[in-house]
Amino acid sequence: MRTVFLILAAAILLSGCVMATSFAGAQIRGRQGTRVANDFPGADLGAKINAADRDLGTSPGEILVKGGGTISTQVILSPGHTLRFSPGTYRLGTALLWEGAFLLKSGAGVIGSGWDTIIVEPAKTGWTVFQSFNDIRLQPAHSGTDSDIHISNLQVKGANPGVDGGVRQTVSLGNCHRCRVENLWLNGTGVIGVQAGGSPFGGNYAQDVTIRRNLFTRVATQAVAVVNGRDVKIDGNTFKDSGRCCLQGMTAIDLEPNDPSDIIRNIEITNNTIDSTNSNFIHGNGILVQNGVRTRGFGPVLVKDNTVIGGTLIPNSAGNVANGIYITAFTQDVKVINNTISRVAHSGIRLENTTRNYISGNKLISTGTGGILSFEITNTTDSQIFNNVVIVDPNSPLGNEVIQEAGTSARNSYKGNTGSKGSLAPNIIRP
């Protein structure tokens, strides 16, 4: 009996040791998957982050950054590594004109704690904050692909007093596949906000990109742009007070291929709010869909359930948006459904040099001033314009209730469109 008891006790003791060893091993493995960048050597936070990234090696893991500071060294984030920022202000001193302050390889991510994680763009040289690695490092530039990159939950604040039209981007995804940009606040930044698509060299393009629930305030030029992409979703974003300076053209959402080999396929623009009430000037368009390079790889495009507000519905005000939704330049197969456009200076909806569109269920309120009509269809063919409402709010009487077809337009169908006095037939103007 004593022998049996001793054997049992020994077994229990051994089992406890094994469990303790296993638990300790799990703790060690957990620690092995996380690095605190602040604890590593380096002249600035960027150098410390790179040291932590190297220490993680090829294993997946997280790099934590705490307390704010200066990032002067370009950060290169390896596959499977997530950079996680605590609250604080992180100032970029990278001074890179053609590369991002952060280059993200496939499978890398950057996550903040919320909009209290503030990354301040370089004060003098450079604007690009986040860029996919192969977009710039694989030659020719902007032709490479990366995948599974995610950026979320932080604020990027403008600091460079200069602006850079439509060349660079704050978030440059390039030809990224399965990439997400969510819950960012781009606050007064000086270049394009978020862009999907790079060079079509090698037949490459962005695919399965989601740009969702972001806030864009006073972004100097296009806030979201797609230049070469398939299956891109632009959903639930808010654009406020667009534009920085009256000399800069600005469109909140812009689909615009730059090369005849680019594609614009299966793009969805849904549930966004564009409110330019407090913009400093009439900045351009709310949503622009164009194909000036005449790529064959165009469409379909869905523009649905968006709200475009050019200004307050008050007397003697035309608003700060030119056209609410503008479909133009050899586009095709665009659906514009259930959008609300109010107090824009020019057309609420304008179709020009486009074909095979379906425009239905939209509401235009106090749009069209200065000889420009609320709803213009010019050089447009084989399109359906159904069940739209075009009215003028008495509190904001600048505007008109006119649907007009002009130019070489042909074979378009109109049904169920209404104004404040009932059924609204189009004016047909032939050359």
Model-based region annotation:
Residues 36-84:
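Acidic Gly/Asp/Thr-rich repetitive segments characteristic of extracellular carbohydrate-active
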Residues 73-75, 91-98, 114-115, 120-128, ...:
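Short glycine/acidic-rich loop motifs that flank beta-strands on beta-rich extracellular proteins
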Residues 7-16:
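Bacterial N-terminal signal peptides
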Residues 1-4:
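Positively charged n-region of N-terminal signal peptides that target proteins for export
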Residues 70-84, 91-111, 119-152, 160-176, ...:
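Extracellular beta-strand-rich solenoid/capping regions of secreted or surface-exposed proteins
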Residues 114, 122-238, 245-246:
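Right-handed parallel beta-helix
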Residues 76-81, 104-108, 147, 176-180, ...:
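Short "repeat-start/strand-capping" segments in structured domains, especially the N-termini
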